[in-house]
Amino acid sequence: MRILVTAALPYSNGPIHLGHIAGAYLPADIFYRFVKLKGYNALYICGSDQYGSPIELNAIKLNIDPKDYASFYRKIQEEIFKKFNIKFDIYSGTAESNIHPIIVKEFFLSLFSAGLLIEKEQELPYDPKIKRFLPDRFVVGQCPYCGYEKAYGDQCEKCGRLLEPKELINPKSAITGEKVIFKKTRHLFFNIPKLKDKLKQYIESKKDVWNDFTYSWSLALLDNFKERAITRDNKWGVKVPAKEMLEILKKALKEGKTPKDFGLLIDSTNEKDLENHIKEYENKVLYVWFDAPIGYISFTFETSPEYRYYWDEKEKPYIVHFIGKDNIPFHTIFWPALIIGRNLGYKNINHILDFDIALPYQVFGNPYLNYYGKKFSKSKRWGVFLDNIDKIDIDIDYFRFYLAYIHTVSKDMSFEWDQFKEVINKELVDNIGNFIHRVLTFIYNRFNGIPPKIEHLDDKDKELLDKIKQLPEKVFNFIWKGEIGNALREIVNTSNLANKYFQEKEPWKTNDPNTIAIAFEAVKTFIILLYPFIPEKAKLLASIANIDIKWDFNQKVEKINKPFIVFHKLSDNQIEMAKQILTNPKEYDLGKKKVIGVLRYEDELYKIELECDDNPWVCLKRELDKRKIKYIYDTVKGDVPPHIIDGNTYIYLLPALEKPNLEKAEEEYGLVSYLDFAKLDMRVGKIIDVQDHPNADKLYIIKVSLGNKQKTLVGGLKQYYKKEELIGKYVVLINNLKPKQLRGITSEGMLLAADDGKEVALLMPDKPISLGSKVR
């Protein structure tokens, strides 16, 4: 029996966050680890979805190649998965795989040869300046409903109304700003309704396999599924195989068929007419939602031809998809329709997959993970973002445990820091961790590390032992149904019973080997079953218990190793620091950056503005040196952190040694009045914690106590002070400074310091004074 586990392909338009992990990748990872543990022949497949309009549009805006843009984020996504210990056998990308376009074209040509495509004429927006059709998202204009000036061609983001490009008032190209015209074009549509009977038969066969929601929703939606376009006028994507289409058409015409049999809008059978008709498709690409799921197959085949058996229908593989609940119809109707259609037509064309492809066995559509009940939003900085997950002092297995513990199959979940801390400290540390550590320590100290054997059983012994023996299959049955949370909670509940048993038996009084022997059976079982949830911690526990991580709960252990504490409680400080780092998504530098240098000479300010592709400081320094402008920072080696970062704008404030030949800076950089100065609320504080900034080599994240509250600051002190030199110092800070994002971390104030261009010295009270005292 072969099991192929897949997780939804993340779109490589940005990093993934904790909601993505909880919705597909962690449940799939846990499921995969369990089936491997059980001894099944299994693969876990994933990769980035790298084509489509959003990627193309963003790349154009940044003046970079779409492939570079998509590859950049694919690497970031893969790194985040690695940090979260998501163990794929293969992680690829639709634009990285050499075989992917070949298999995608095979699917397309199979549908074409089977008569499952329909040609339709549409009138779509066109940019005459660059001579290309525009996807809906490439068109902007005034919303006809609310008047918003920057509504997209598919939706107004202000009022939320769904739109058509033609509805916009004064529609313009998002690429050039040119007024768009509407021009006729032809596209091919997948005739899904033609396969309705076969799809209904397939869905009905899953009545006892899929959960009730997935089954009933898919069946209800089937009647409303219409033809869907599978070609687009984009540049970025898998090219439509127009030449092969024409060859299939010519061959079929010789067999007595007509263009109408292929759904084409042409009556002529003249070879030249057909060539001209099909030629239009040479400049089109296949729709991203058509090519993306085929990536499951492409990525499997990247490793070795033997992996074909995970897709060959004759082999009866178990193909299991993990996705978000919004993706259910796509995987229960559209994707099976593609497979059915491909199987009907592939023998009529040149193909590399010489077998019928198996339909999905199981589709797990998981609920969403919200953040305090609300949807994740990068722009609003609302959620838990994973770019810097390795920069915090919390073990990844703690996040894995918590997300699995709160997992449900019926309603949306919510990540909350207080609950996270409570679940870890109560269930993982105090319950499971404490029980395992107590038993192992007891064996090591009282029995010289040699686990005793079971001699006799009383009723309490039998009760616990029976539950322990039944636990593996109970847990696996939950896992097989995609009920990850129920599986883990079953382990937690059984651990509670084991703790109660241990307390009631009081082996520290009796030194009863029988009690310890039964408790050790529980320990071995817990460790093995916890491995898919918390693999690194489970491996540590297994090394102490001297057992192998395998589906064998009766392993004989001659002697255990010296125990050590594996689980530690989470502190408030750990939570606060993690919250600061993980609720601030990292900003990535793609494309041009705006750099502003503000130079002060005597009482005047001057500025220079640049657009740079490389390091902002290097770019500014290069231009200042080129203009022979003398400034104090010319003695500083290496990168200099900007004083202000605002999106993709970097501002440097530099003292000039002579009057620079630059334009005067605007008033916002100029002198302030006494009344403006009086607005500053300066207070005495004490530095209580210092951490390295995860996104900047020369910045610290500094915790300052004001007595009745604490503040988090970001300061460029790393080259002037060691961490230990700062902790405990009394300092002066601006308390009412507007919070500012500095390289992804919110700074809630500013420390006062003197700077002569070579050295920096913090301003500190010269004698003891109460924390929070006002500086006047």
UniProtKB/Swiss-Prot annotation:
Task: State where the protein is found.
Answer: Cytoplasm
Keyword Iron, does the record have it? no
Question: What's in the keyword line of the UniProt record?
Answer: Aminoacyl-tRNA synthetase, ATP-binding, Cytoplasm, Ligase, Metal-binding, Nucleotide-binding, Protein biosynthesis, RNA-binding, tRNA-binding, Zinc
**SUPFAM superfamilies membership:** Anticodon-binding domain of a subclass of class I aminoacyl-tRNA synthetases (SSF47323), Methionyl-tRNA synthetase (MetRS), Zn-domain (SSF57770), Nucleic acid-binding proteins (SSF50249), Nucleotidylyl transferase (SSF52374)
Quick one: a GO cellular component term?
A: aminoacyl-tRNA synthetase multienzyme complex
Q: Which reaction does it catalyse?
A: tRNA(Met) + L-methionine + ATP = L-methionyl-tRNA(Met) + AMP + diphosphate
Give the cofactors, semicolon-separated.
Zn(2+)
Q: Which InterPro entries does this entry report, sorted A to Z?
A: aa-tRNA-synth_I_CS (IPR001412), Anticodon_Met (IPR041872), Met-tRNA_ligase_1 (IPR023458), Methionyl/Leucyl_tRNA_Synth (IPR015413), MetRS_core (IPR033911), MetRS_Zn (IPR029038), NA-bd_OB-fold (IPR012340), Rossmann-like_a/b/a_fold (IPR014729)
Detail which positions bind Zn(2+): C143, C146, C156, C159
Residues bound to ATP = K378
Query: Which N-terminal residues, if any, form the signal peptide?
Result: none
Chain location of the short sequence motif 'KMSKS' region per the record: 375-379
Q: What class of enzyme is it?
A: ligase
Which EC number applies? 6.1.1.10
Q: tRNA-binding domain: which residues?
A: 676-776
Which biological process, per GO, is one annotated for this protein? methionyl-tRNA aminoacylation
Which Gene3D superfamilies does its entry note?
HUPs (3.40.50.620), Isoleucyl-tRNA Synthetase, Domain 1 (1.10.730.10), Methionyl-tRNA synthetase, Zn-domain (2.20.28.20), Nucleic acid-binding proteins (2.40.50.140)
Identify the residue span(s) of motif 'HIGH' region: 10-20
Cofactor binding mode and count: Binds 1 zinc ion per subunit.
Functionally, this protein is described as follows:
Is required not only for elongation of protein synthesis but also for the initiation of all mRNA translation through initiator tRNA(fMet) aminoacylation.
Which NCBIfam families does this UniProt record tie to the protein?
PRK00133.1
Concerning its family, UniProt says: Belongs to the class-I aminoacyl-tRNA synthetase family. MetG type 1 subfamily.
Q: What is this protein called?
A: Methionine--tRNA ligase
The gene that this protein is the product of is metG
